[in-house]
Amino acid sequence: VQKEDVESLHALGTAIPGPARDRGLDAPTRAIAGFVLIASLVWIVLHACYTAFPMIRPGADIVMEAKFESLVKARLFSSEDRFRVLVFGNSKTLAGFRPEQFDAAFKPGVHSYNLGLPGDARILPILEAALAAGNVPTHVLLTIPWDNKPKPTLLDRLRDDESILYTLVPFRDLPRDIVAFIATSHFQFRARYEESRQERDRMLAQRGWYFIKGQRFFPSGELPDDYSIPTDHPDEFLARDVPARSFVLSELERLSRAYGFKVVLVPGNMRRHAQASAPAADGQRSVAVADHPDMRIIGPDYWIYPPADYADSVHLNPVGASEYTRDLARLVADSGMLN
């Protein structure tokens, strides 16, 4: 009888909720909810700081965001622009192509922009952003070839840890950026912040051209004539790879047909002593785009410029950028594509 009474009391205690039992069951739930709440608050605060103070980021990040969020989303062309030219590439293009000087080499009606990105050789993301904003070019100039990668699969995207991380936590580098900003500002925070803003606005006003003076090796912004580094190959020509098949190539062809623009691969720039001079253009270079009527390759792989035209080992200074832009304008004019 006593055993049955004990079992009955136990069953009754299980069926009837009590304060003590509720607290025991709810403890894990409350802990999880508390963690999620605190994590959400921290995320909101850090994201607010990241958004409110964009000029504390490195110059490359500021330029990248400004080109995607401000430049290509604005109205780039007018009805008077008969030839609308967008130039793509990496940081060498960012520092090397001066749109206003390029346009001045032609009759009125040519309008160009520098869409070179720092530390990023991708073509499609910023081209698609420009097209989505209604900025349709007549000519797309590529200073670097497309890659040979196939179309990314869902598994490829899931393996891209860095992209996923930056999507979920865009302020991942905020602590590093704050420390770097304090170190470079010498505690002149307002002046340093305003300087970054002015550099961004200057880049936008110059239609995407940006002198990367923060990486210059000498105060003058020029390298000495005998400058060289161990990785140079002054007697070797390293031809750039121009794949005949790739996802980017297929997308460029699809977009060129849909929007009616031409895609042209043009020469890049190379510092003297870094590599040997590139041979003149020949018919073999056009084999890769032989099946694409709206695409062509003109000029050599690159042009050679003296070290004095470079601010660091790879990026042109303003004088070098003017030289490269002049050569590019001459090549484009001789090709007849803007006639």
Which positions does each model-derived feature cover?
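Membrane/wall-proximal cationic-aromatic binding patches
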Residues: 42-111, 118-122, 128
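Second-shell loop/turn segments in exported
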Residues: 87-89, 113-117, 235-243, 270-276, ...
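Secreted/periplasmic serine-hydrolase-like ester/acetyl group-modifying domain
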Residues: 155-259
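Loop/turn elements at helix/coil->beta-strand transitions in domains of secreted/extracellular proteins
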Residues: 82-83, 108-111, 136-139, 257-264, ...
